[in-house]
Regions:
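Membrane-helix interface motif
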Residues: 63-74
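Membrane-interface helix-loop junction between the first two transmembrane segments
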Residues: 25-44
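Membrane-embedded catalytic scaffold of the fatty acid hydroxylase/desaturase
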Residues: 52-61, 65, 80, 84-240
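Cytosolic-facing loops and C-terminal tails of multi-pass membrane proteins
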Residues: 225, 236-293
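Residue-level signal for inorganic ion chemistry
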Residues: 28, 48, 223
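Short, strongly hydrophobic alpha-helical membrane anchors
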Residues: 1-10
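Hydrophobic core of alpha-helical transmembrane segments in multi-pass integral membrane proteins
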Residues: 16-26
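Loop-to-helix transition at the N-terminal end of transmembrane alpha-helices
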Residues: 12, 16, 39-52
Length: 293
């Protein structure tokens, strides 16, 4: 039998995430990390429209199927976590860590495989980075991610409570790392010992392809350090956000973004003049594992 506590977070999660979103939106307005290059009135309607599609796909498809998988494995004692007789708190903690690790791999796959990137690229095409970018995804990416989520939950043997807690942590961390929020440098360095922070994730949204190939972690930053994809020493003032081949206004309207995965694509990582953005080693001070201003 599944304990009643497994559904305890369900009513709390949406309200808590709305509070996190509004708090980050307020803070990033007062303490911006990077100067905006586009007016909000041009970006936010597009971002909110894409977010609506993401929320619909998540509520109608991803979460029901992932929850169903979590109930199935809990009832049948199936999955990796069930191979060891762990106390419930330890099983929850290990489950959260393993879900985050496997999501790191999934994020990398969305960059590595071109068919997946055609959808995931919609997220990276945002010419500025703020909390509204956090859910700016193509609904198609959310739909095909359902298969990954069900396999992740099923093979790991994640129970409903652990799944819901990770889902809440994932969404909150996603908003935090995308926020255009200037934290005091010492505070961000301290937080970044464990968590992905705005400066860290901002590098992942750079127009420099080498930097996009770094910092894939979602909640815990350890996975980038473990897989040698961690890069922190890029000054935020030098970062241009977006994808160089798709920075013009016509590329960031709603309909072109919806049909982007279906169209013949030009080279994502070249400017219009055919050159590729690069950053010289002299422009990245200090060690790659230490955040700079």
């Amino acid at each position: 039998m599944i304990p009643e506590i497994t559904l305890l977070p369900l009513p709390i999660i949406p309200l808590a995430l709305v509070v996190v979103f509004l708090l980050l939106l307020t803070l990033e307005t007062g303490f911006p990390l990077r100067r905006r290059t586009w007016p909000r009135r041009r970006r936010l309607p597009v971002n909110f429209a894409l977010t609506a599609g993401v929320m619909a796909a998540g509520l109608l498809v991803v979460r029901p199927l992932a929850l169903a998988a979590s109930f199935w494995v809990a009832q049948r004692n199936f999955g990796l976590l069930r191979l060891v007789n762990l106390p419930t708190p330890a099983m929850v903690l290990v489950g959260l860590v393993l879900m985050d690790l496997t999501f790191y791999w999934w994020h990398r796959a969305n960059h590595r495989f071109f068919l997946l990137w055609r959808f995931h690229g919609v997220h990276h095409l945002d010419p500025d980075l703020d909390v509204t970018t956090a859910a700016r995804f193509h609904f198609g990416e959310v739909l095909y991610s359902t298969g990954f989520r069900v396999l992740q939950v099923g093979l790991l043997g994640v129970d409903p409570f652990t799944y819901l807690v990770y889902e809440a942590a994932y969404q909150a961390a996603n908003m935090f790392q995308h926020a255009n929020l200037r934290l005091p440098l010492l505070l961000e360095r301290a937080l970044n010992k464990i968590l992905v922070t705005p400066r860290m994730h901002g590098i992942h949204h750079s127009v420099v392809s080498e930097e996009v190939g770094s910092n894939f972690s979602v909640v815990f930053r350890w996975w980038d350090a473990m897989h040698r994809t961690l890069r922190l020493n890029v000054p935020q003032r030098d970062i241009i956000i977006g994808v160089p081949g798709y920075l013009s206004p016509e590329h960031n309207r709603l309909w072109p973004l919806v049909v982007l995965p279906l169209r013949f694509s030009k080279n994502y990582w070249l400017w219009s003049d055919g050159t590729e953005p690069v950053r010289t080693p002299s422009a990245t001070p200090g060690r790659p594992g230490i955040i700079v201003e």
